[in-house]
Amino acid sequence: MNKYFKVFFFVLLTHALKSALIFGQATLQKGLSLDIDKDSKATDRLVVKHFDSDKQGYKAYTFKKEGWEYVNVKHVYFGERLLRVGRDQDMKCDYVHYVKVFWKGELAPFLIKMKYYNWAWVSTRLHFRLTPELTWAEVFVPTIDENSEEGYMKLFKKRMDDFVSQVGEDRLATYKPFTEDPSKKRFDLTPTDEKEDTNKKKYVLMVVVVVVFVVVASLVVFLVKFCLK
């Protein structure tokens, strides 16, 4: 009886530890958390959701909070090649371009869609408030030599530079500069490290599972011995 119980105890303990590890790994997929201090009284926690579409060739970070919608449009991914929208440093203008690249089958020409996002009060200047009243602008970009990647990318870059410049000039002609409203609190975003906190939770959960299991196993042993008497 003792031998079988030890085997049973070992199997249950192994299963409990395995379940705890799997659960702990799953909690790592929360994404980036941001602390927003809107009223200088309490910090509001929200989670950034990550959307990735290789077929359409873009990545964007979006999050919503109390009717506000923001999107991080710093990088646009084109296959395995990374194209940058804006600069590595802080944006110098109060609007930003969001580009989605589409392939048309095996043909070299592709479609670019562009949409504007007005900058809101965010300290990093990488997040922008969505303005849904602005519509998409579609551009058809032909290529010089669809068999030459170098020529293709050069033309793409030139057409993109020209297009962004043209749209930017048209937009700035009617653009009203953003004015700070003293009655509204500035949004201060500070990225926090979720991994360290998640690891602590994982190990605490493992310890709790093991302790509970040992207590239950001890109780079972006591009951078995009591019944055998």
Curated annotation (Swiss-Prot):
Membrane topology: Single-pass membrane protein
Sorted UniProt keywords: Membrane, Signal, Transmembrane, Transmembrane helix
Residue spans crossing the bilayer: 204-224
Keyword hit for Secreted: no
Cell location: Membrane
Cytoplasmic-facing ranges: 225-229
Signal peptide limits: 1-19
Topological domain ranges for the Extracellular compartment: 20-203
Superkingdom: Eukaryota
Protein name per the record: 23 kDa piroplasm membrane protein
Listed GO CC annotations: membrane
